[in-house]
């Protein structure tokens, strides 16, 4: 326990010199990791409630979210529909790991991607999509899985989402659409509708998958057309009643 505490303090305080001086007998040699798979990493540690998160976040800022040089493959599933500002995603920069990082965007919010459904089983088929994708990637990289394992995880891209407004989610008033496509390692999953209607903003290589008119999803809030005046209605009536070619 003492060694674990010492290692934790060195990691937390960023004491590189202290790490170098640790007894080699207490440390493992360089161990390569085939794959790290994460679900919508948001760096949202501590109490993620309005205002209270500001009190706890400084305690966790020391965490290093970058992939280590001993990681061969980094795979991340990301939520397109999450809008809570406190849940901004930590998207990896693939420049330091060219060709080794894959980040896939899926329909759904943070709890959908992570499988935190709170008993809402109707959302399970949507949450299973990133799960099956992640397990498939792990299997391709050598993780042995039972035969026909996919049959245990039915998927449906049209299934309802848990959403981000349920329960305490209503208290998160600070909202902003996510930005997808800034890194070359980002892609849209095949289950996402094309053109993608939002709310996330697509940029980079994903920009071409956005609708030509990105605000068209708001058309149901458009103002109604002006009601014609009596004179306009009287003028239109004879034209409407006239026979074709008359």
PLM features: residue spans?
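Active-site- or binding-pocket-proximal scaffold segments within functional domains
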Residues: 1-246
